[in-house]
Structure formats: structure tokens, C-alpha cells
Amino acid sequence: MYKAETRGITVTVEPRFVEEESSPGESRYFFAYTVEIVNNGSEQVQLRSRHWRIIDGRGACQEVRGAGVVGKQPVLEPGESFSYTSGCPLTTPDGLMAGSYTMSTVGGESFEAEIPAFSLDSPHLRRVVH
């Protein structure tokens, strides 16, 4: 499990390899990740948008930006949490993801809540020892 906290917003990510959605012989590896966002702060916040950096095992970086998460822009009161699961296909058996959520307060202030960097590792990864 991976965790980051920004201004009272805790983001926890738990990734996993999805064998049944993958086809290693065709260089297709699918990963799912479950995210929990907890408002440990003292004011209401709303998740407005997301920004992901996805880096495959060859170092190729893809950036993904969009409104909300899984079609939602959840409002979190102090003490509330929101969880969702999404997925990421790669053409390599490993990679990593990191990013941020743009959050806004009731007063209209925006800030970036860090999404911790997390590794995507499949059992098909061949480790080389020199």
C-alpha cells in the first residue's frame, strides 16, 4: 500500500496485477488500482480533476488529465472518504504511476493533493542479476 498526505488529504493506493485481463504473449499487461481519498482536514473539499504520469518498463511516459475520477467529482466533508477502483494497461510487465488531484475548498481555493508514486509489477517480469 502506498500513501501520501497533502493539506489534510490522505491518498492511499493499492495496485494489483489482473491476470485474466492480461496477455503476456501479446505484450498486454493490465493492472488495477484502488484509491482511497480521506479528508482529514477541517474544511469541505471537492475533487475537481486528476493528473496521472504513467511510466512503463522502458521508461516511456504518458500523461493523463481529466475531470474528476470514474465520472465523479466527489465532495468530502471533514472525516469523510471516497474510494474507487480503476485500471491501467501497459505493454511491459512493469511500470509505475504517480500524479495529483486538483482539489477545491468551499472558499474557492484550489490545491494539488499528491497521489503517491506506486509500482505496477506483474509476475511476468524477468529480473536480471549481474
From Swiss-Prot:
<dbReference type="InterPro" id="IPR036767">
    <property type="entry name" value="ApaG_sf"/>
</dbReference>
<feature type="domain" description="ApaG">
    <location>
        <begin position="3"/>
        <end position="127"/>
    </location>
</feature>
<dbReference type="Pfam" id="PF04379">
    <property type="entry name" value="DUF525"/>
</dbReference>
<dbReference type="GO" id="GO:0070987">
    <property type="term" value="P:error-free translesion synthesis"/>
</dbReference>
<dbReference type="InterPro" id="IPR007474">
    <property type="entry name" value="ApaG_domain"/>
</dbReference>
<dbReference type="InterPro" id="IPR023065">
    <property type="entry name" value="Uncharacterised_ApaG"/>
</dbReference>
<protein>
    <recommendedName>
        <fullName>Protein ApaG</fullName>
    </recommendedName>
</protein>
